[in-house]
């Protein structure tokens, strides 16, 4: 079964929504989010730079380590959100796991690079972070879904617009539970 353009676009919306929701909950401000493909990616979440103090190559101060952890969580969140969504679909393409891995290669490269500043036990650290991020996303799945739906209507959002969509999804979540 070939993945349709609609399926790929939905997967991208969930992928980018995962990044944005985790960034929001890790207090990492985002500049914007898009699911409009360009030469480099199918979508992206952009962040403001952390500041000149963020030099993981020069030290392991607590705030540097916290920033590494936050950005590792954010980097893992896209693939994990896409996976959670794909697992919930009644019909899956034959190669759906490979499609997710392929789409997340750039994210994973960045995550491994950041993790290597944190610890020499990168594999174990990332396995722990994946469990943490999956739990974080599952607890906030309505926000992920709400933002993914909003991105279907508005494929390019500023950080403020994305935050508003997350707040609206949170209100809806509380109203229906």
Kindly give the residue locations of the regions a language model identified:
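Soluble catalytic regions of large protease machineries
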Residues: 2-177
